[in-house]
Amino acid sequence: DDSCAIGLVLAMAKGMVDSGYQPENDILFIAHGAEEWGASGTQFDWTTGAWEMINNAHPEWAGKTIAMINFELPAFYDGMSQGQISCVPEFSTLTKTFVETSGLLAEPVDAIYPEGISAESVDTNTMEDGVSYRASGVPYFINIPGTQEGEKGWIQQRYHTVADDRDTYSAQVMQTNLNTFGALAIYLDQTPALALDLNATCDDLQEALDTTLAGEDAQPYLDALDALRNAAQAHQEEIAAINAQYQDALDEKADQQTLDEIRERGRALNAKTLDAFRFVQEQFIGIISTSDIVIKHVAYQNNVDVIEGVIAALEEGVLSNEEGSGALDLAWMINGGAEYGYYSFSTETNAASLATLQEESNPGNLFWGTDKGSVLAQTYPATVSLLEKAESEDGDFTEEIAVYAKEQAQQERYLQEMIRQETDAMQELTQMLGA
């Protein structure tokens, strides 16, 4: 796991030094501490080393770091036919260009990935150090660590144990990741204007909205999104124009002063791009529980939808069925699955657990989860009651329906409020990009 990632970082640094590569930007090689655990009393207890690095040790990196490249299990082969690159959504266009047209990407070593490296990126998650940098406005990439699902898979049998030893090491995968991400670092370094595509942000905002649940707030949201999309596209065209001009200057063997002037324009635009990216993280990006990265209103939207299904099932008198549409088949999904704890543990245990998840009960101890959560639906009394009635076969669910209905209405109010906040934020971001 982590030892190979550190080895890869050091190998990349050595390769650049030994080759005489002269970067246009500062390139820092970092090994973070506390990647697996670094805090107590919080559900956001991992990647705290990275959080401390970007927030306290070097907060000046935020706003001028064009990319962070991270590694997880970079020498493990799980049988994939095609290698993949994971990144924030706004880097998906750059990834496609890098793979398809940059000319820098080498073929996988010994055809370890017989279908090569995919041009289609995969969105990142919260399970590694990149999430701490992203929260501070630093966009990032990471290799795709293999998992091998199922009880006999590598994750289940070896991950985070002494069985993650030398016989799990693949030199071909390690060298392929070194080649791929080393070339990506050079590609980023050599490109004057950072191709961080905010059209992807617009796509996520569009996909996130359930217009039916949003009701009368849907149209203002969509109108603001249309304006933002136009601004994002204009910004992307400005990025492309600078990079095209730079490439033309290189092809024409322009003098150094000309190249430096184009690069300076690129740096100025990069500052604007990174400001916009950080704004996106602060205003739009939420986290459900500690795992799902979503547009903020989705947490409430999901709750409204799930609770509606629970109420409908109770009105039919169905707690559980083979189709999975009974009230108890659905209720565990409330609050991003946090309700599931009540199926096995006491209310006291669940209260202690949830206190480590929420800002108001655990201030200053959420790290990369700060300002990313939502107000949870207080449906657990009804859920606990249903679990008890499932044992007694009591079929009167009037009181439980009332609890769920009340909390659904409250979640609807939070949903409306968050959609309106996001609408205002889209308008502000449009102005930022147009300035």
Regions found by a protein language model. Name each.
Residues D1-A435:
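Secretory-pathway/membrane protein signature
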